[in-house]
């Protein structure tokens, strides 16, 4: 990760403040909207949702559970719930991770979608060839997992390790992947670490790395999480209101901010040469109005 812990801490502090400000003012296309749409679209998409990014944005903007052009109302309901769950994660950053809190996340996500949201599974389930916990084992295993996690200083490695164990237990009937990724996102923020979103485009790497971690090869999944941290920071950094921090982040990430100069690459004679041409055929310079001058310099 090219960003120091201190720079990550500053990023998270600024990010949380800007999320709160933009939520209140409903700023379009800002840090908040960009984060929610990316978080929800990708984490729903890799679970099989058919909604496009545009449809996801529409659900976010309207907070509606019905899309006229959607033939999968269940996807819409889950997407609407997911956007609310994102807000819940931020509203609860001061709360320690507990089994009951994990159930609350699941309730936010699956309300109106399944009969018993926010409750551990009562029937067995599986993830491909992975052997998950039996229903009667879930309460004890989750209690132990959370208790052990909370004993140690938060770090990306510990967050990733928690995520793998949570997904292997698979404590809910459905929604385990989305809840697990939501926990990882929130715990990164609580730890002052740049959060990461598992993208639909990188899901094969994610799933392969999960399997490798279960087999004892931990480096690939941690490296994947670090790469997704860089991806997230690269997207958000140019949009931060704190220009000094934004520039520091972009510099460390090796990203050059666009330079909006007067010379925008337009072709043809300049107003000065045009004036000369007009004068040469008997026109006066007064016919070229001063208020037609173009100034393209823009602060970003």
Where are these regions (language model features)?
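FIC/Doc superfamily catalytic core
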Residues: 1-174, 178-300
